[in-house]
Amino acid sequence: MSLHSLCVPTILLISVLSICLSSGGSSDSKLHRILIKRDAKEIESRPKAYISVQQSKAKEFLSGLHRTKRNVWDRSRPDVQQWIQQFMYMGYDEARLETDLSYWMDQARSNDQGRQHHHDENAPMSQQDPRYNRHGANVNYDYY
């Protein structure tokens, strides 16, 4: 009896809320539309100098921004300079060399067996799906 007495008010509440939320025909409420109109009027009424920055100041700020060059290796060492010269002799340009080196160094870091967990990290669902929890290759037994 108590379950029935709880279900009826709950169903009535859900139906009233769904009717109230679906009325109006649009996704935005009237209050939301009024607030948007008010904000648009405030923005239009502001003077332009209040919003924008002078062009000279903007160019001065943007001219200082530049991306620093990525160096995977310490180029001050003579052996590194020799390696880079050899790679460039083989046809690599420096940007391609940096890209390839960072890729392979990241690969080496991610495939380190000491950092592997006891589940297969390459599986579609990882450890969440028990079918892909394998105890074989790529398993670090230090965790047991």
Curated annotation (Swiss-Prot):
Q: Which residues, in ranges, are excised as the propeptide? A: 19-68
Subcellular location(s) of the protein? Secreted; Cytoplasm; Apical cell membrane
Major location category of this protein: secreted
Which positions make up the signal peptide? 1-18
Spans annotated as Disordered: 109-144
Skewed-composition ranges (Basic and acidic residues): 112-122
Q: Which domain of life, per UniProt?
A: Eukaryota
Q: Name one GO biological process term.
A: negative regulation of cell population proliferation
Q: Which UniProt keywords apply?
A: Cell membrane, Cleavage on pair of basic residues, Cytoplasm, Membrane, Secreted, Signal
A Pfam family for this UniProt protein? Augurin
Q: Cellular component terms, GO, for this chain's entry?
A: apical plasma membrane; cytoplasm; extracellular space
Role noted for this protein: Probable hormone. Required for the proper formation of the central nervous system by attenuating cell proliferation during development.
By sequence similarity, the record places it as follows:
Belongs to the augurin family.
**Name by which UniProt lists this protein:** Augurin-B
Q: Which organism is it from?
A: Danio rerio
